Amino acid sequence: MLKGAWQARIVTLFPEAFPGTLGLSLTGKALEMGLWSLETIDLRPFGEGRHRNVDDNPAGGGAGMVLRADIVARALDAASVGTPSERSRWPVVYLSPRGKPFSQAMARDWAGAEGLTLLCGRFEGVDQRVLDAYAVEEVSLGDFVLTGGEIAAQALIDATVRLIPRVLGNHASTEEESFSEGLLEFPQYTRPTVWQDRTIPEVLLSGHHANIARWRRAEAERLTKERRPDLWRAYCAARGRDPDEDREL
């Protein structure tokens, strides 16, 4: 690992799930180059009894099991060794469907930190007391439920690592993609020029860069207005525009 490289530490019952897809393509190459590092902390050895139990029945009754606060705390303590205590420099995140929605802005903030600890839940979740005691931020990948946090953790790390300098190679790629300016990305095309009687928009073949830029901006605005009205309203509010105004999108 290169000095000062961004670090990801994952507390999980399934350390064998990593690096998974993070070990492939550009993120995998960057991992090999030492541009970032990945460490898993297996929750099971912190469990109690002969079977290293990590969970118990939910207080108040109900289905499923809950990860115990004392056991998760020991794992988080192990994961925190050598990390700064300030959460702005080293966020500690629990993947949860009730958390704040993950966003590109969040990924940018995390990429600017020294590293990140991710707690992957299982069963019915984690005892709330340990989340409160350790100032753990709850983050959601979307309005759906997974069997555990490992898949979500890989997605969040991928979104963050690709923003680290030199990982993608072409920095312009991150400036033009979806959410970089609060908009969805414009449509992309490549050869052949004609496919199944469908042609590439003529403006993209014109070589007129100003016209191409205007077309791409208009398409990005059109798609955002159609598909993500929430993003569209925020985009317009930041620019003093009426989100209901038609502007030849």
Swiss-Prot record:
Gene3D superfamilies: 3.40.1280.10, tRNA(m1g37)methyltransferase, domain 2
Keyword Amino-acid biosynthesis applies: no
Gene Ontology molecular functions: tRNA (guanine(37)-N1)-methyltransferase activity
Keywords, in A-Z order: Cytoplasm, Methyltransferase, S-adenosyl-L-methionine, Transferase, tRNA processing
Catalytic reactions of this protein: guanosine(37) in tRNA + S-adenosyl-L-methionine = N(1)-methylguanosine(37) in tRNA + S-adenosyl-L-homocysteine + H(+)
CDD domains to which the protein is assigned, alphabetical: TrmD-like
InterPro entries xrefs: Alpha/beta_knot_MTases, tRNA_m1G_MeTrfase_C_sf, tRNA_m1G_MeTrfase_TrmD, tRNA_m1G_MTases_N, tRNA_MeTrfase_TRMD/TRM10
Ion transport found in the keyword field: no
Major location (coarse): cytoplasm
One term under GO cellular component: cytosol
Location in the cell: Cytoplasm
Chain sites annotated for binding S-adenosyl-L-methionine: G121, L141, G142, D143, F144, V145, L146
Subunit structure of this chain's protein: Homodimer.
Similarity comment: Belongs to the RNA methyltransferase TrmD family.
Summary of the function given for this chain in its UniProt record: Specifically methylates guanosine-37 in various tRNAs.
Name of this protein: tRNA (guanine-N(1)-)-methyltransferase
Lineage: Bacteria, Pseudomonadati, Pseudomonadota, Alphaproteobacteria, Rhodobacterales
